Amino acid sequence: MPRWLVWSVLLPLGGALAAHAGDKGGPAVGDIAPDFKSWDAVTHERIHLSEQTGKVVVLTFWASWCAPCRREIPVLDRLQSKVSKDQLVVYAVPFQAPDQAYGPLVKIFRSLKVTLVEDRYGSIAGRYRIDSLPHLFLIGRDGRIAAEHKGYGEGSIPELVADVNAALGPAPAPAPADNPPPAEH
């Protein structure tokens, strides 16, 4: 490979790394979650994170080649199945090369309640500074990061469920009936 070609690739990369050298890393608990726009890879519906304010969002970064990630997705699917999408949305952002086809993932996610978010060029993963997989952010109703989980194991499920329950808060009061029963004396 010609030396000029190597340097033409390494110099910009080195500059980008140096620019981020002093950064604290990704967003932290309490920070406003970095916004993104994308689409659901299965339904092709637009997704705009900031439009989810008022809902709890589980945002997980994963890869099909990552064994813990493959174990985490069914757990998140069961979680989404138990809570209405009016209250909670679960987004799975695949971490893969831009040229990898989404077709096999779409086939898997068609049968799941979890939303497969397209991130072909890694821009969403870049905003969150993903450095390990799976990497999950729990975003509260106010748009702030309520919890962060790196890695996955069976022992992490209770903590994740507790964090989601805390973010959801107490169950909302039931809507008043159209014809309330008469008061008893």
Protein language model regions, located:
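Hydrophobic beta-strand core positions in alpha/beta domains
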Residues: 60, 92, 137-138
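Positively charged n-region of N-terminal signal peptides that target proteins for export
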Residues: 1-4
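Short pre-active-site segment immediately N-terminal to redox-active cysteine/selenocysteine motifs
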Residues: 55-57, 61-65, 132
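N-proximal helix/coil linker or "cap" segments that precede and/or mark the start of modular domains
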Residues: 15-35, 170-185
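Bacterial N-terminal signal peptides
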Residues: 7-16
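Structural microenvironment flanking redox-active thiols in thiol-disulfide oxidoreductases
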Residues: 70-109, 120-126, 162
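Thiol/disulfide oxidoreductase modules built on the thioredoxin-like
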Residues: 106-112, 119-165
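A short beta-strand-turn-helix
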Residues: 36-57
